[in-house]
Amino acid sequence: MNFKPRWLATGIGSLPVLDPEEAVSLILEYLPEIPIWPQLPQRGPVEGMVWQYSEGMPRIRSDVKSNKIWIDAAGDLTPELERFYEHFFAGNAEYFALSREFAPGYYAMVNRLKSALPKEIRVLKGHITG
């Protein structure tokens, strides 16, 4: 790959808008060479990066009403860990996919790019929580 960014603009992901389609339009207008997929935390806690990556993880519990997320270490961890690793070792990537409920901005961007990939795009930027 012969990509030389040369000070091209990109973003961190979070945008202060509620509508996923509006977010995608703003991103493609202002970050045309290195667009991000939008996270829209003003829509609610599940749009936050920690919440998005907690979905499907063993022993992670959450309560949207109180905006809390935690690890439940009580009881036998084995069944949830087995289920998690069965999917992992089977290569079942769909099990680990972001859901439309937790990441509508991601799906809005994917759908827009599938319908018409702008020629200005050099790289797509994603985000992970580590």
Question: Model regions: which residues?
Answer:
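Alpha/beta catalytic barrel-like cores
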Residues: M1-L124
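Active-site-proximal loop/short-helix segments
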Residues: K125-G130
